C-alpha cells in the first residue's frame, strides 16, 4: 500500500521564478524629473534666503538712518529696498563732495574724461552713414550741455604757473566754435543751438589752401 500512495510532489526549481520575475527594479529618474521633484524645496530655500537678507538689510538701513526699529516694524520689502537705494545715492553724493574738497583736480579729470568720450561719440557718428544729421546734432548738443553742467575746468592752485592747462583755448571754424579735444585727433564742432558755447572768439580763416590731397582739414594741423 505504501508503494501505491502518491508522495508529495517535489519542489520544482522554477516554482518561485514567476514571483521574482514579476518584480522589476525601479527605473532611475531622469534629470528633468529630479529637478521637477526638487523644485519646491529649492524655491523654499530661495525664499528663505531672500527673507533673511531683507531682514538684515532692514536692520542695517534703520541703524544707518538712525530710526527706531519699533516704529518701522512693519516695513514692506519694497520700502526696505527704496530706503536702501536713497541712502546709497546720498552716500555717493557725500563721497563726491568729499573727493572734490580733498582734491579740486578731480572734477577737471572727470570733465576731461567726459570730453574724450564726447569726442569718441562724434568720431563714431561721423563714420555712420545711416545716422540723420538732425539726430547727430541733437545728440552732440545734449552731450555738450551735460559737459557744460560740469562747470568750467579750473587748474588747481598747487600747480606751477608753467604747467599746461587742462584744455587748449577754443578755436573757431566756419563761424562756429570748436570744442578742443584733449589728445583726440580732431576737435568737436559745437552745435549752433548751444548759445553758451558760441561766445565771441577770435575769428579764424574760413578756408585754407587745398593741396592735391583733398580739402583743408583744420583738425590735422
Curated annotation (Swiss-Prot):
Record-annotated Orange domain positions: 110-143
**Extent of motif WRPW motif:** 216-219
Location of the protein in the cell? Nucleus
Give the main localization category.
nucleus
State where composition is biased (Low complexity).
1-22
Recorded GO cellular component terms are: chromatin; nucleus
Q: According to the UniProt record, where is the region Disordered?
A: 1-49, 201-221
Question: Per its UniProt record, what Pfam families does this chain match?
Answer: Hairy_orange, HLH
Regions of biased composition (Basic and acidic residues) lie at 24-35
- Domain bHLH spans what residues? 34-91
Query: Has keyword Transmembrane helix?
Result: no
Among Gene3D superfamilies, the record links this protein to:
6.10.250.980, Helix-loop-helix DNA-binding domain
About its domains, the entry says: Has a particular type of basic domain (presence of a helix-interrupting proline) that binds to the N-box (CACNAG), rather than the canonical E-box (CANNTG). The C-terminal WRPW motif is a transcriptional repression domain necessary for the interaction with Groucho/TLE family members, transcriptional corepressors recruited to specific target DNA by Hairy-related proteins.
According to UniProt, the name of this protein is Transcription factor HES-4
Organism source for this protein? Homo sapiens
**Gene that specifies this protein:** HES4
